[in-house]
Amino acid sequence: MVQIFKFLLKSNKSPARAHFRPSFLDTLRLAVRGGHGGNGLPKYGGVGGQGGCVYFVAKEGLTLRKMAQGLKDRRVAASSGEDSSKVSIFGKRGVDTRIEVPVGVQVYDEQQKLLADLNENDAKCIVAGGGTGGCTGNNFLGRPGENRIVNLDLKLIADVGLVGFPNAGKSTLLKAVSNAKPKIAAYPFTTIRPQIGTIEYGDLRSISLADLPGLIEGAHANFGMGHKFLKHIERTRLLLFMVDIFGFQLSPRHPHRDCLANIYSLNKELELYDPSLLEKPCVLLLNKMDKEGAHDILTKVKPIIDDLSSGLADCPEEVRPKRVLKFESIVPISAINSTRVTQVKSQLRRTLVRLAEKQFVSDGEQIKEQLQQRVGLVGPRIT
C-alpha cells in the first residue's frame, strides 16, 4: 500500500533542461568572521594572541561557482589567538584564512559599501579582522573578531563588450570571430548567461569579447535582469553594438522598432544606467545584410547613423536619449554568412591599439606633471 501511495504522489514534472539550469554565477553572499583574540594572563601581565583575519586573494581562471563549491555553508572563519600562559607570555597569533576569488570581483558589505575592487591577479583585501588579544587595556579579555556579511559581485573583464537586443545575431558573431561555441537558435534570449570568447590573430595577439544576453527596453531599471547584464560592460574597453538592419520586436504586445530606433534605445538604456558608459569608444555592426532590401535600408539610415543628433527630432520620445553615441566605425555585416567578419576583427584591433596609444601618452604626461610638481623650485624643470 505504501508503495502505491508513493507512486501516486510522485511528481510527473520533467526536470528543467540543462540549458536553463544556472551555471553562471556572478554574485555570492558569504558570512566572514575574524578569529577571537586570546585571553591575557593578569598575574604575569601576559598578552593574548591576536585573532587571525579572513582575506581574499584574486586568482585568474577561477569562477564564483568553483569558489562556492568549496564553501558549502557559505561561512568562513579564521582561528582564534592563543591564550597567554606561564610558558608563553605572549600568545601566538591566530592563523589567517585565505580565500581565493575570481579576478574582477568587487566586495561589498551589507550596506552596499565597497570594501575592495580586486581587478588584478594576486590583489588582496582583508574582509574580517581578528580580535585584539587580552591585555591591560581590556582587562586581559580577548576581543571577538570582526563578524560581517559580505557580497561578492563579479564583473567580467573583457576587451570588448557585445551589446544589442535579443535575436540580433550576437552569438552568431561570437562563434564566427572567436573560439567560443555559444548556443544559437532562431528565437530571442538564446543567450541566457554572459559568455566570453577569444579572438586570435596570426601574430599571436588575442582580444577577449564578452557576449551579453539581449537587453530589452527598461534594462536600466532592471527589467529583464538588465542590471545583471549591464554591469559586465563597465570594465570593457570597447563597446560593440549589434543591431538588426530590419529592426526588432520583442513580442506582439511590443511595438516594432526599426534599426534607428533600436540604436537610440540602446543609447538611452546605457545613458540611464550609467552615463559614463557613453564615453567608452564604440563600434556599430548592422547585421543581416544578406537579406533582400537590407542595402536599401542602409542607404537610407547611414547618414543619420553617422550623426545621431541629426535624427533626434524624428526619434520616438520614449527611446530618445539626451546624449548620443559617436561610433568609431559602422560596419554592415552578415554574421550567419561570415560576411565582413575579417573586417570586424581588424577594426576591433585597430581601435584597441589606438586606445592603448592614447592611454600611454596620457600616462606619460601625467607622470611628467607629477615629477615637475615634486621637483618644484628645488631642481631643474623637465622640458
UniProtKB/Swiss-Prot annotation:
For whether the record's keyword set contains Nucleotide-binding, the answer is yes
Enumerate the spans annotated as OBG-type G domain: 158-353
Which terms in the Gene Ontology molecular function aspect does this entry carry?
A: GTP binding; GTPase activity; magnesium ion binding
- Residues annotated as binding GTP are 164-171, 211-215, 287-290
Q: Can you give the residue ranges of the Obg domain?
A: 22-157
According to the UniProt entry, where is the signal peptide?
Answer: none
Superkingdom assignment:
Eukaryota
What is any one of the record's Gene Ontology cellular component terms? nucleolus
Q: Does the keyword Nucleotide-binding apply?
A: yes
* UniProt keyword list: GTP-binding, Nucleotide-binding, Nucleus, Ribosome biogenesis
Q: Which Gene3D superfamilies match?
A: GTP1/OBG domain, P-loop containing nucleotide triphosphate hydrolases
Q: Name one GO biological process term.
A: ribosome biogenesis
Subcellular localization: Nucleus, Nucleolus
Q: Which InterPro entries match?
A: G_OBG, GTP-bd, GTP-bd_Obg/CgtA, GTP1_OBG_dom, GTP1_OBG_dom_sf, OBG_GTPase, P-loop_NTPase
Question: SUPFAM superfamilies per the record?
Answer: Obg GTP-binding protein N-terminal domain, P-loop containing nucleoside triphosphate hydrolases
Give the UniProt family note: Belongs to the TRAFAC class OBG-HflX-like GTPase superfamily. OBG GTPase family.
PANTHER family for this protein: DEVELOPMENTALLY REGULATED GTP-BINDING PROTEIN-RELATED, GTP-BINDING PROTEIN 10
Give the protein's function.
May be involved in the ribosome maturation process.
Q: What is this protein called?
A: GTP-binding protein 10 homolog
